[in-house]
C-alpha cells in the first residue's frame, strides 16, 4: 500500500500503560496492584473536543484474568499527558465483566460515546463459545457530556448489532471513529469481532450509528475467518479500512484487512498486510491528520 507510514508497536499492559511525552519522559497512567485493582489491561485513548486526553482501561479486581470482577475505568489529562486524574469509574457491575472499551468523540457536540461489552463474571470465554455459560456476551453504549468526568447508565444494544447465533462478541478494543467524508459525515463506526455458534473461528465486523450513538446497526461482516480484535480508520478517498488481529496463521502471519466503500455497511474480501508481522496481538490504527484533514499517512 503506497504512501503509508508504518509504525509497529506493542503495548505491554501487564505492567502498565505508558504515554511518551515530547521530552522523552514517561508517565505511568495505570500500574498493576494500585487503586484497588490487581491489573489493568485493554487500553483505548481519545482526545476530547476540549483537548482532554481520556485513557480507558479494563480494571481487573483480583487478577489479570479475562474473567471475574472487571470494571471499566478512565483517567483524564488536561495538560497533554503530563499529569493524570484519579481513576473515574465508568461502569462497575459488581462481580461481572465490563470491558472492551471503544470510545468515540462526537466532534459536533463534544459528547463522548463509549461502546463496550458485558458478561457474567463467572462465565469464561470458552463456556460462552460452547454455549455452556449461564449468559452470553452483550453489547452496551454509554456516554459522557462533561468531558469524561461522569458517565450515563449503560444502554443495551445487543439485538441491533449481534446475530442470535453468535456466541462470543467483542468490540474493538480500540477507539472508534466519526466519519468526515461528505457521504456519511458524522457517522460513528466501531470495529468488533464475533464467533458463530458451532464453530471455533473468529470473524470481524463493523457496527455504525447515524444518530450520534442513540441507535446502532450491524454493518459489514468479513466472510473469511481469522479476524479478531480490530480497529477501523477512514482513508483520504473516503473508504474505511478494517485492520484485524489475524488468527488464520495458515494464510499469513501478518495482520489482515478489509475495505469498506460505503461507510461500513459492507466490507470487501479479507487481504493481508505483509509489512505488519504480528504475534496475534491487539493493534491500533490511526490516520495521521494534516492541518485537520485526513491524509494518506496511516499509523499502525
Q: What residue ranges belong to the model's regions?
A:
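Asp-box/BNR beta-propeller blade signature and adjacent active/binding-site loops
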Residues: 22-300
